[in-house]
Amino acid sequence: MASDDDEVPQTFFFSTSGTGNGVWEINRPQTAITKLVEQGIFHGEVLDIGCGIGDNAIYIGKHTNNVSITATDLVPKPIEVAREKAQKANVNIRFEVVDMIADLSATNLKQNSYDVILDAAVFHVFSNKDRLIYIKNLEFLIKPNGLYIQLCFSEKETREGGPRRIKKSDLYELFSSQNGWTIESIEDAIYESTSAGPLGLDGRAYLSLIRRHKSV
């Protein structure tokens, strides 16, 4: 198990993502995300960060009316795969290669433009330093009163292997009211992986719904 401040090196994703060998490439959307779709959570301008091969974004696009979806990943290869899958599914998604801990002003992502931001297994790959940069970029991207959805491995997952675990106490500190956020809910969930993954098919996770304040 990664320690509290461990990050997953970017080189790992460049060598693995989009090849079919990533344990997160299950070729279907995460069940936790499909349930949110059924609840009507996604609307307006949606940004899927770390979209990988696109299964969550494509599912949202196919099963949600009147949404405009942008999906990003650090690595070009899974974006290529995701574009092909979206075309075959006849779902219109804008795909971008973006490093979410870099300067976003040089990208096509627009400030305060997104009603809903989805993060399925991104936050838990960052070091403490990098996740502060990441949160600043979330604040740059999200609309006032926008919703940030995070699905990441939780402290309740005690099996060895995989990225760092996210502590509920850290979420409340990082996404505090003083920082311009309100945590609406943190629920136990499952992050599904392939059987080749160190945590098997059912990594214990938190599904967090976090609201940006209307005025910050």
Where are these regions (language model features)?
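Class I (Rossmann-like) S-adenosyl-L-methionine-dependent methyltransferase catalytic domain
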Residues: M1-L47, I53-L109, F126-F140, G146-V216
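Short catalytic micro-motifs in class I SAM-dependent methyltransferases
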Residues: A121-V125
